[in-house]
Design a protein with these regions (language model features):
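Long, low-complexity, intrinsically disordered cytosolic termini of multi-pass membrane proteins
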Residues: 1-2, 477-623
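Membrane-embedded alpha-helical bundles of multi-pass transporters/translocases
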Residues: 2-490, 522, 564-566, 591-623
């Protein structure tokens, strides 16, 4: 069936986002694939070690090598899939067609992951490798990359886009925070134990559920942005050039090493969670230990967003993240003191997760600063290239960590559970070497990575001059626009004008829809139009008043704050005032010297990149 077929058309016909799109396309639709992936991320390795008993296969080397090799393939397919989506042009958009394809692939590959033949070892090995790569390297890669693009491609209206993003986030939190973190360890896992037939039944149900829900996401989403850009052609910077720019910048390298170390520790912790709760802190699938660790340890993540940004604004994003990792390490040390004591571990996990708040909420903002720095330095935005590397690190490390974790289990003597004659799961008493390996994975590894990150972040000074660099970017853009005889507008003005245009367009669309509704129901359009306009104006007036009140409150609050600081300063002795003034002057002088050095290096590099690109253009024209 061609993508031009009306049967494949989106059920969303409006230019503005409707409730059906939010609830069905962005909340309920993604739930199937997200649930399947979240369960696999937590329990697939448990299935391999405890149900299929693959820990000792090939002397423990199989579960070490195959995840690493598979994730290398996964990393490659991520890059290829990104390229394919960018070059897909159909009536249904560029991402939605791949959502449609992923629906049956997720179901088939999800079932194949668990229906592993046990009779022949060679067949079993090949089945595990092929099914794993079919799901992660193809099915889920196709789904995830197209799914992640749906919000950006849905609309240009920032309010509507923000609303869709919230619904998407609710779907993720609902799945991972409630179903997988609470329901599964409390109810489902104690029921299925290590009974292979029950695992197959459960995962087949989840895989089958992904099919209709992913189709729901396909039919109740719409790529409005793609529809607007059909036919446009843009001059592209060579990927090799962007790659050189990214890998020759110190801040980019620091942020990638940061992400690599952080992901390494986090992945080990996530892999060790189930085993730690089953053998060290609690008993096998006791239904409560894992839930307590996940929920109590995760409470700060829910409330922390209200505290993190005020702190980050006051002391800086880098500093907030760095000090957070000090708490992160402290929490891990507390857990290590008594890893079998529930109260001690929960306290340690709570402190640890408070420390982890800045890196969870602030990292992408720091990453954005680095991307702005790259643009200032080279004159080129390298967002896509940088994000590709970011994704490759994330994907590859999951495989590497899984392989290393399984090697630790195998070489420390891990004993898989068994089923007795009554079908009850019997957990083996693990040797101390296994308990030590599991405890190190869940608790100890992140203590080491947190300390390394505190040291590494000391060198990430991108915030120091980022505002000056952003001003420089705008100045350069203005000069380039004037050379071409164009009028330059700053980003705030452009954003405001685009927002105003979008509001007018949205209003016109709503009026058209209202007219159709009036014609259909025999209503008086002029009366309904007057009511609509009156309602919209009342909403705008209320929003303006609210904004003005908020601005007044913020201004008054800032005034009180400054007055308190000034009063406190006035009470200081003259010597102290002098010392503070000298310190501020030195800080300003150091900043100016730092900026001048950076500015000189940045200008030279930007001119170098520009000259290289011009040479390539001349060479291409001559060909």
């Amino acid at each position: 069936m061609s993508m031009e077929s009306k049967l494949l058309d989106s059920r969303i016909k409006t230019r503005s986002v409707k409730n059906s799109e939010k609830w069905l396309g962005y909340l309920l639709g993604p739930a199937g694939a997200l649930l399947l992936n979240a369960v696999l991320a937590t329990y697939l390795n448990v299935y391999y070690t405890d149900v299929l008993n693959l820990t000792g296969l090939w002397g423990g080397m199989f579960l070490m090598i195959f995840p690493i090799a598979s994730k290398i393939i996964d990393a490659i397919t991520n890059v290829i899939m990104g390229y394919i989506i960018d070059h897909t042009k159909t009536k249904q958009g560029k991402a939605r067609p791949w959502l449609l394809l992923s629906a049956p692939l997720l179901t088939i590959s999800g079932i194949l992951l668990f229906t592993v033949p046990m009779e022949n070892e060679k067949v079993m090995v090949w089945w595990v490798m092929i099914s794993y790569n079919l799901f992660y390297s193809f099915s889920y890669t196709i789904y995830n990359m197209s799914h992640n693009l749906m919000v950006p491609l849905s609309t240009r209206n920032t309010k509507e886009r923000g609303g869709l993003s919230v619904f998407n986030q609710i779907a993720t939190i609902m799945i991972t925070g409630i179903l997988v973190a609470m329901i599964f360890p409390m109810v489902i896992m104690p029921m299925i134990g290590v009974d292979r037939s029950k695992w197959i039944s459960l995962m087949s149900i989840l895989s089958l559920l992904a099919l209709p829900l992913t189709l729901l996401e396909y039919y109740f989403t719409k790529e409005r942005v793609t529809e607007e850009t059909i036919g446009e052609e843009k001059k592209e910077i060579p990927f090799s050039t962007q790659l050189k720019i990214v890998f020759t910048d110190k801040y980019t390298l620091i942020i990638f090493v940061y992400f690599l170390i952080f992901t390494f520790g986090t992945t080990f912790k996530n892999l060790g969670l189930v085993y730690y709760c089953n053998y060290v802190l609690g008993s096998y699938n006791d239904g409560i230990t894992q839930t307590l660790v996940s929920v109590i340890g995760g409470i700060p993540m829910g409330i922390g967003i209200f505290a993190v940004w005020p702190i980050a604004k006051k002391i800086g994003k880098r500093n907030a993240t760095m000090y957070g990792f000090v708490l992160y390490a402290l929490g891990g040390v507390i857990c290590s003191i008594a890893p079998r004591n529930m109260a001690v571990v929960l306290i340690g996990q709570f402190i640890k997760n408070i420390g982890g708040l800045p890196c969870s909420y602030v990292f992408m903002a720091l990453f954005a600063d680095v991307l702005d720095h790259i643009e200032w330095k080279s004159g080129i935005r390298c967002d896509g290239t940088a994000m590709s590397i970011y994704n490759i690190i994330a994907v590859a490390l999951v495989g590497i960590c899984t392989g290393l974790f399984n090697m630790m289990l195998a070489h420390s003597g891990y004993i898989a559970p068994s089923i007795d004659s009554l079908g009850k799961t019997i957990a083996a008493a693990q040797p101390q070497s296994v308990l030590n390996a599991i405890t190190f994975s869940f608790v100890g590894m992140e203590v080491i990575t947190a300390i390394l990150l505190v040291f590494l972040l000391r060198f990430l000074n991108v915030e120091k001059t980022i505002e000056l660099k952003q001003e420089e970017i705008f100045r350069i853009r203005k000069e380039e626009a004037e050379k071409e005889g164009k009028i330059y507008k700053d980003p705030e003005t452009v954003a405001r004008e685009e927002s105003e245009k979008e509001e007018i367009r949205t209003r016109e669309i709503k009026l058209e829809e209202l007219k159709d509704k009036c014609d259909k129901n025999g209503w008086n359009y002029e009366e309904k139009k007057a009511e609509f306009i009156k309602s919209e104006e009342a909403k705008k007036k209320a929003e303006r008043e609210k904004q003005l009140n908020n601005e007044k409150k913020a201004k008054a609050k800032e005034g009180v704050k400054k007055a308190k600081v000034r009063a406190k300063y006035d009470l200081l002795p003259a010597e102290k005032k002098k010392a503070i003034k000298e310190k501020e002057m030195k800080k300003q002088k150091d900043l100016e010297a730092f900026w001048e050095k950076e500015k000189k290096e940045g200008t030279a590099y930007r001119n170098f990149v520009k000259a290289k690109l011009e040479m390539k253009d001349i060479k291409n024209e001559s060909l």
